Each structure stands twice: as C-alpha cells, then as structure tokens.
Amino acid sequence: QQVEAFSKPWKIKNWGGPAMNPGLREQWQGKSKVLVTHPKSEEIPCVLSAEIRVPATQSPKLVLAVSNHPKGDWVLAVKIDGKSSLVQKVDQSKWQHIQLDLSDYSGRKINIELENRANNWSFEAGYWGEISIRRD
C-alpha cells in the first residue's frame, strides 16, 4: 500500500531492515512523500517492479531521484526485461538525479526492476524521492 501511495503502479518484494523503519516518509532532504526501502539481506535486494508501457515519443526516460542514509550507502541496480541497464552506488547523502534513456523500448510494454542492493551491510536504506517515466 505504501508503495502505491508513493508511485503507482510500482510493487515491492523482499522488503527488509525493520530497524531502518522502511516505508513512506512525509519528508526527507527537502522532498516530500519519500519511500524508504531496505534489502532483505546482504544477498537479497529489495525490489521495486512495474510493467510499464513506454511512451512512443522521441526520447522517453526513466527518471529517478535517490538518496542514502548519512551513515551508509547502497547500490542501485536497474533491470529492464531482466537485463541489467544500470548499476550505481548511492553514497552522496544528497539527492542523486538519474535519467535512463528508454528510446530502444519506445511504444513497447516492458518490465522494470529497481533494486536496493546492500553494500557493506551498514545503513543500507534506499530513499526514493521520484520514480517516473518522462516523455521529453
């Protein structure tokens, strides 16, 4: 429910880290309505997934705003139809704005998975300020 309140049509699996109190935050680092996730274990990432129809426009993009807990970091992995499209460490303790070109999938229905992977297993919470598809 909290994921849908944050951003439909995203679903979540392998939500862990009760000590990090995952869920929806009213505000974090100047953004409102922020989703906090945490990997289930060092080996099992928390996964946000959705089936999306990519707009048939010139340069559709997956747009993310992600951050980390000030005492930790995590690894963001993006998979499209099961294929790795991005692996990036999130460790700046500020919002990182990421745009992933979806032009190759224009007009198609795709499955996107956003993984919150562990990195050294210390304060691995992922903070999501935006997950959207833009039609630029």
Language-model features: locations:
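Gly-Asp-aromatic-enriched flexible segments
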Residues: 1-136
